[in-house]
Swiss-Prot record:
Name of the molecule in the record: Nucleolar protein 16
Designated gene of the protein: Nop16
Organism annotation: Rattus norvegicus (Rat)
Disulphide-bonded residues: none
Family: Belongs to the NOP16 family.
Cross-link (Glycyl lysine isopeptide (Lys-Gly) (interchain with G-Cter in SUMO2)): 74
Amino acid sequence: MPKAKGKTRRQKFGYNVNRKRLNRNARRKAAPRIECSHIRHAWDHTKSVRQNLAEMGLAMDPNKAVPLRKRKVKAMEVDTEERPKDLVRKPYVVNDLEAEASLPEKKGNTLSRDLIDYVHYMVENHGEDYKAMARDEKNYYQDTPKQIRNKINVYKRFYPTEWQVFVASLQNKKMEVD
């Protein structure tokens, strides 16, 4: 098969093109990624931001969304005509967002596995004797008795049910030994 005409010439580098400006302009013109999946799926790229949000029943400007009490106006100045409400064409977006917001927040902060193992080891071997814990060979960071007590209290606060189970298992072990 013959070569395509005009493809034998190699590409030459364009020295007169400012690559930094080219990339910056491309970044500016690119539409940002919408993080919220509900809004992203309902988004219409042919419409403006204001139109899209109005269709979803969301407010573009939070100051305009919440009506503020105006000063008292005399009866003659009052207009009987009110502004017509915007038509919400995509109410499911607001419903989904409200449902997502009403879910309980997932607990994201946990303790490291090393700290949990450290607390278990110290309490198993020394009970409530923090000075003995401070002298223990597994106390790699040379924590003071007060620091060790604070670490144990943090563990108790983070995992109260696990702490109760752990203490109960220690009591059972003590009973079996006696």
